[in-house]
Amino acid sequence: MNSSTVNRVTLVGYCGETPEMIYIKSTGNPVCNFRVATHKNYKNKEGVNFEATIWHKVSAWNNLAEYVAENVKKGSKLYIEGELSTSSYTTPQGVRKDSVSIQISELKVL
């Protein structure tokens, strides 16, 4: 096992929707899923400045999910630390889809 790897994400961005808390049927654990927007500035070939919005899927679990549900609203500026998590599923048409999200370990409303 290689212990010299890192899976860590830090975001400062804006909540794009009011988080909804759901409960996992098998465990009863709460989770809040929502999206956070960050922005990237760049210049095109002609030197014109543009701003691109990048959307990140994020999830908060258990006590952190309850905190998010009570304190985070659409438009809230957030500081988030967490790790990337991947999952995959197969569509009814038999196509495999992969999804990446950020599992939040620390969140502050700024």
Model-derived features: where do they sit?
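Single-stranded nucleic acid-binding surfaces, predominantly the OB-fold ssDNA-binding core
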Residues: 1-110
